[in-house]
Amino acid sequence: MKKANRSAGSVPKVSGISKPQTVEKSKSENSSSAPTGGKPVKPGAAAALSKTKSNDDLLAGMAGGVNVTNGVKAKKSNCSSAAPSAPAPAMTISESKSKSSTGTSSSAKRSTSAGNKESSSTRERLRERTRLNQSKKLPSVSQGANDVALAKRSRSRTATEGDIRMSKSKSDNQISDKAALEAKVKDLLTLAKTKDVEILHLRNELRDMRAQLGISEDHCEGEDRSEEKETIIAHQPTDVESTLLQLQEQNTAIREELNQLKNENRMLKDRLNALGFSLEQRLDNSEKLFGYQSLSPEITPGNQSDGGGTLTSSVEGSAPGSVEDLLSQDENTLMAHQHSNSMDNLDSECSEVYQPLTSSDDALDAPSSSESEGVPSIERSRKGSSGNASEVSVACLTERIHQMEENQHSTSEELQATLQELADLQQITQELNSENERLGEEKVILMESLCQQSDKLEHFGRQIEYFRSLLDEHHISYVIDEDVKSGRYMELEQRYMDLAENARFEREQLLGVQQHLSNTLKMAEQDNKEAQEMIGALKERSHHMERIIESEQKGKAALAATLEEYKATVASDQIEMNRLKAQLEKEKQKVAELYSIHNSGDKSDIQDLLESVRLDKEKAETLASSLQEDLAHTRNDANRLQDTIAKVEDEYRAFQEEAKKQIEDLNMTLEKLRSELEEKETERSDMKETIFELEDEVEQHRAVKLHDNLIISDLENTVKKLQDQKHDLERENKTLHRRLREESAEWRQFQADLQTAVVIANDIKSEAQEEIGDLKRRLHEAQEKNEKLTKELEEIKSRKQEEERGRVYNYMNAVERDLAALRQGMGLSRRSSTSSEPTPTVKTLIKSFDSASQVPNAAAAAIPRTPLSPSPMKTPPAAAVSPMQRHSISGPVSTSKPLTALSDKRSNYGEIPGQEHLLRTSSTSRPASLPRVPAMESAKTISVSRRSSEEMKRDISASEGASPASLMAMGTTSPQLSLSSSPTASVTPSTRSRIREERKDPLSALAREYGGSKRNALLKWCQKKTEGYQNIDITNFSSSWNDGLAFCALLHTYLPAHIPYQELNSQEKKRNFTLAFQAAESVGIKSTLDINEMARTERPDWQNVMLYVTAIYKYFET
């Protein structure tokens, strides 16, 4: 506000500046109308000419005349008082003024020529007319002054009424503000029309007065005239010198104030650019700004070329706050009165207000009339500084727009990744729902089958009671068998009751768990809907930011066009200034010629010369008044600039606070989303753990049901035996001795068969041990041979390293391809083996249980494969080590192939040592830098395999009393036992679910490690892996990967021998992509990206890039 007060305080100086500025400006304007040839000058003016001190004083003395001076003063007062009453319709008045001024100058020239012709013929008649005109002149001037005073009163009255209306309208609401603004605009328009009529009337009177005064002054030859001239010539030079000094001081003050305003405007603009905001962002409607800027080039030259003073604002006639009110009202006025005739005036006013907003440096650097005459070097320096500042501001704006585009792309990429992950979570939730429904159906089936079995058990119990009653009726003695088996029956009944009670309790627990899971799923679906709504709001926010960026780009183009137009305007002003300077020089030369003619004594035609000089002086004074009005207009513009800058600062503070609030709201929303995602992750993990617990409970129920089926089958056998006993008890005594003899013979035969089976087993064991020893010996020989070959290879490499480098690289690539093919073959075989095994369902298990009840021996022998079978061990990545290490490793890996084949052939006895040996070779050949399988896990598998082999030996040695069929069955079940004794069999359900999830989605573990979404976790992993590499800045999955250096740096951390990173350059995109993709393909990672498309586009598809980086992470880190 201090700046505004200071600039507003400088406004009253306009009235003091007007007269000297008029004199100085008239020098350059009247040079064209001065006569080149002259008549003899009269000797009566010699005394006046001798008193002149300079050419400027000579002009003032030769153009003397009280009446002319008074007329000019009246004209200036009329113009200066008419201007502030109608600032809005400035353009229309200025155009009419320029036209009328040109008409006045032409009519004055014609009247001057006619007066010169008449003066030669009728001098006597004109003397009397001049006396009459002198007497009439004073009333006409007083009448003009009265008109001016009336106009001032009417303007002050209308201005005060407008201020009262404005003060009232500010306290009302927006509707009343709009109505008041419309009423004020109408008043201003009507006032402008009335002022136009008054100005035209005054111009006509002024034209008549000029014509009359010109004729009368041509032939003024009296003593009064000479005395007046002498007094004016005596007093005028001192007045001119004082006014010139005052004008120079005021010009320097104005120049310093403009420099200060320019510096402050630049500082504010630099601060705004540093903060990242442009001045046109605070406009409510950007299209208004573009319309104002398009109109501004037409208005600025018109204001500079105005001949009248309609835009000058004086202190006496202007009401306080009128400029501020217009600045606050111009937008609503534009919206309400687009159909009025004076729309151009309001547009010009708006453009004058908003031009400093768009290019304030250019507006401040535009030279005023006094500066253009006095200091051209300062003008040129200002022009250069304004051009540099505008270029710097445009460059800062371009850089800011580019940065906002990058942030926008990164935000949109992150939003798309979040949407994709939410869709995946929704799909997983649906799968869990379907799995839960399936488990519920299976549970219902299990409960139904359990009820059926309990009904069967009760039915069989009733049958047993019936059979016992029958035995009691026939008095058959079964007391011995009942005594023997009664304890077992009681125990079985007690166990059955306990199992039934436990089944009921577990059923109630399962129902509660199912209800809890259903409620949790409902809550998760509701949270998912809320998250989708939040994502939609974020999408709308991103679209809004895109529209803002487009509007900023349009504003940038409009700024550039306005800058060019301003440059053209300044160039035209410079040309006009040079022309005026040339005219001033010519005028000085003519004045010198007149002075020489006057001194020569030829004074015959001095009155004609004085008349022409007086006309030139009038023109110069009109020009000076116009320049004075331009200066006042410039001050008004400076005041408007100060007010506009203050308003922009207030709006910027408000915008900054609003932006901070929005950022805090967005941060809070982001934290809420993160917390909700974490809660969903925990709920999902809890649901998975609950599902795995339910699977364990289902397996327990299956085992219990199998046991119950066995009990039921025993009871059925018991019933059959009781029925047989009913028919065979009478013949039991007769056949007892014969059965004893047959059983003794069978026992002896069984012992002989058992001995032969033991001999065969010992032979097979000795053969297997001999084969194992042979294989160990061959392995030892192969290792020694491999060591010799490696030593020879090292010697050859030390001697011929430079010659054999190409062959070693070719051999390395061949070995890597073989290993990749071997790895792919193992993966295909693994997948085929896993896919070929059908998963057991509840219905198939129930059918198997029902069939087992009919065939108990077969059910006891068949053991189903558990779902907790271990995954096959991965081979170490051959490409993660150097080529020589891969060459040394490939030997033992290739020699381990016959071991696996032999272990497959002899799965009964040779599998355990073969697997143990394979684990040892793989653990020794794997590099220490990238361990795929932990050492503790391999030790566990080795210890488990040893225990299983020892237990199998003890079972074989202890099974001397078993049959060969049971021995073979035990041999076939031994691999299943060894598989079930793997380390994964003892894993908890939560870790087992985590392992399955990581195999299905490798980024889930990464998201748990780094937190947040999968996309952000993978981005953080890439940043961590490429930390320390030069020219790498990974912020997204599109533009950060467009030169190929990020791929090369990421693969260089694993494959340093394939990528010479120090030799790479960001300009050679195709070479970088080729090296990275070839290195990835050499280890088996298929390239899903096109090299040409990646090298051509600046922003590749982020989803394809993310998939490829995910493949790299999956290969090397999982």
Curated annotation (Swiss-Prot):
It is found in: Cytoplasm, Cytoskeleton; Cytoplasm, Cytoskeleton, Spindle; Cell junction, Gap junction. One of its GO terms (cellular component) is microtubule organizing center. Residues 168-281, 395-450, 488-808 form a coiled coil. GO terms for biological process: actin cytoskeleton organization; adherens junction organization; anterior neural tube closure; cell adhesion; cell division; cell migration; negative regulation of actin filament depolymerization; negative regulation of microtubule depolymerization. The modification Phosphoserine is found at residues 385-386, 390, 869, 882, 888. Signal peptide: none annotated. Pfam families: CH. Involved in cytokinesis and spindle organization. May play a role in actin cytoskeleton organization and microtubule stabilization and hence required for proper cell adhesion and migration. This is Cytospin-A.
